Structure formats: structure tokens, C-alpha cells
Amino acid sequence: MRDEVPSCSLAILTAQIKTSSTGVQVNPSDHNTVLATYSQASPQDVKTAIDAALAAKPEWESLPFADRAAVFLKAADLISGKYRYDLMAATMLGQGKNAWQAEIDAAAELIDFLRFNVQFAEELYAQQPAHNSPGVWNRTEYRPLEGFVYAISPFNFTAIGGNLSAAPALMGNVVLWKPSDFAIASNWLLYNILLEAGLPKNVIQFIPGNPEEVTREILAHPQFASLHYTGSTAVFRKLYGQIGAGVAEGRYRSYPRIVGETGGKNFHLIHASADIENAAIQTVRGAFEYQGQKCSATSRVYVPASIWPQFKSRLVDEVKKLQVGNPWESKNFIGPVIHAASFKKLSGAIDAAKEDKDLELLVGGTYDDSKGYFVHPTVYEAKTPDHKLFSTELFGPILTAYVYDDTKDPVAAFSSACDLVDSTSEYGLTGSVFASDRAAVRFAEEKLRNSAGNFYINCKSTGAVVGQQPFGGSRASGTNDKAGSINILTRFVSMRSIKEEFNATTKVEYPSNE
């Protein structure tokens, strides 16, 4: 696949359309290598895509659920077999994932999303009124939304691109899918797998393009019904505001459903009773898997002074072992960051740290973009708990540690550490506590109940599994609608209660009138 350069078209009006405006996706491990070229949607293309999707909506939503489900179940089978390695390769080359990370994303998680969503939908449709009065039949209909769904997917998970577009479509909606420019190759392959599985071509419109231009046309349309988004907090807040302004103007036929999962400044909180080896190894994995480019990645760790020397030693030793290089070479744990802008942001943070007296570099601190965008895993110890590295999301392989003093009053120190965890960051996505003392676990679980939508005990802050740990957070991290659960599907249906009476009413008066 490294020697092939696919051309990715728009997918509008049952045709693949090539436009005069094009972009390229490069291999982040070798930024001189073009992985894919793609057409960019113009404002008129977006309008055409909306019209095509809405024209396809009546037939698609009227299909029996079993027929819609069959499409996505077949797609899951195609991904599990025929296209597994192609999709993994596109993810490895285009998004910089090693084989393990590509497998658990582009294969396993994507397949799980497609299959579990069918099960969740069946369970949702089965939720019917618990009681019928004599002579009355009550039922609930789960209607697709009136209009279309706008799905904006990120670069870092092929599975998310699939879920953002496929989940609403499964429920009978039509979708305009804007993929990340940095995941075009894998997302285009996935789109074509859905078509091969039997998805009507106009149900999901594949529209790469300038984000602001595409979004402007979509949010201006009166039949915009929902946003399904994963990406940065800043962009989500902007979109939320634009949609709110549209609601205030009376622009939309209904109130759009807004579903978003954004950033995180995820924590590991270590208690003095923790298994030090486990806590250190889990922290390395949580921070540096996929170069820290997961919204759930561990980026801050709080360690008690009583075990800091042992923890630091093991942490640094493990980080030093990590191999950095091309993701298709099996020895490498760390691959490239996704693009030049990310590299610039991360290398800038490393450069700034060199002059920062409140930071001590423990390991790493190097980078190289001569061929690919490589940033070596880096760990700092901060002398102050309010350092900006504890609150600024960098989205890369940089971890910051703070050592809290537990030598005088361990219980009070752990409580204060919980307060730090909760108050330092605006996010609320994921976090972990490491302790063998059950009282400490229980204390942290309660104290940090709003600090993380996914809370882990004695395991890393990453790795939510569909059907096991529904994923999402609140505060600045999103709407917490929980991908990988039945809850997310409720956001893409509109319930209608239907009451039918079998017996005629014969008089106006109440029994009390007699």
C-alpha cells in the first residue's frame, strides 16, 4: 500500500465526483510521501449532497430495521475478513499507528461498533410502554430525526469515523460525513466497504473539504437535525454557539441534537498503597500509546512523595525502552505525530520547557522532523501543581508529574491530591486511581465523581471497549452521550407515543356527572 496513491472522490448523487480543488494526505512517517489525493467539496457540492441525502431519506427510513441492520452487519464481516489488513494498513500509514494500535482500532473496535449498535438498536426498539389499559393499545415509535445528521470525524481513530456516520444511519437517518483530512485513506476505504455491504449511495455522503466552508453550508440549512462530532474542544464550542444562534433565529425545523466528544487532560492519581510496578507501567502505556494522540491519553500523574523515588525509577526505565520509528516496523512502540502543526506545537512546548525553572526533564525532550514528525516520549516533573502543563491539552507524547507530600498526614494529603485533580483542568473525560487500600479507592471514586466520565481503578486511563466501558466525558470534554452504549442511539431518534382505542366512546358525560 505504501506504493499506491488512491484518489478519493466526493460521494454525492450516487456518483464519485472529482473536483478541481484537491488535497493530499501524506504519510506522517515520511512527509514527502503522498498517501492519497482527494477532492474537496465546494459550497455547491455540499448543497448538492444535502439534497441527495434528503431525497434518499424516505426510502431508507422506511426500510425495516432488519434490512438496515443487515448492511452494517455485513460491513462488520467484510472488515473482519476481506478488508481487515487493508484497513489496518491505511490506518498505519496514514495515521501513524503501529500494528497493535491499528488492529484494536480499525479492525476490532470498528467491528464492535457495527455489531453492538445493531444489538443496542434492537434493545431500544423493544422498549415499549409497560401497561395497556383495557381496550387500549400503547406503543412507542423510534423515528429517525427529521432532516439530516452532520458527522465530523477526527484523524486518530478510524473506528470513530465509522461510528459517527454509521450509528445515525443505522437508526434510519441520512448523514453528511466530513472526515479528517489526515485520515482520508482509511475513511475512504471504509466508506466503500459500507457501499459494498449494500448501503445505498446517498444515505451517507462522503464530503471532505474546507471545514469552515462545509460547515457554513450545513448549519445554514433548515433541515440540519444533528451534529455528531469528535474533535477539539475549541471547535466544538464554536459549533455549539453557531447552532445555538441558528436556534435563536428560528432557522431549523426542530432543535438539533448535539452530540460531541472533545478533549481531555486525563489523570493518573497514585496512592501510597499502590502496586508501584503496575502503576508505572500503566502510566507509560496510558501516556504514550499512539504517541499520546488519544483524547483519553494520560497527560498528568500525581504521585506521593513516599513512593516517588521507586515510581520515578520504574517510569523512566520503561520510557527509555520505547522504540521510536516507522509504525510498520514491529519493534517500534512510538510512531509519528499526525502532522506539521502538531509537531510544531509539541516541539515548541519542549523548547519552552528548557527555560522553565519549574520543570525538571526526567526523560525524552527530543524531536526530529527531518523525514517524519517524530517526538520522543517526554516526562517532566513540575515543582508547582498549577503549572500550565497540568491544564493545557497538548495531544502528544508529553507527560507531567507532580509529587504531593504525604509524609506528615497521608490521608489529608491524598484528599488534597484529589482536590488538585478535580480543580486543575477544565476537562472531565478519563482518569485513574491506583491503590490497594480499598478505603482510598472508595474515597477517590466519590471525590472525583465528576472529574471523569470514564473512571478506572488500577488500570490506565485509555482503552474503553465497546459494550464494556461506554465512552465519554462531560465538562469541557463533551456531552457524555457514551459511544459504545445504547444511550448514543437515543440521540438519533425522536420518540412518538401512539395510543389506539378499540372500543367506541358512547357519551360525553363523566361517570361523576350521573
Regions found by a protein language model. Name each.
Residues 1-35:
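Hydrophobic face of amphipathic alpha-helices that form TPR/SEL1-like repeat modules
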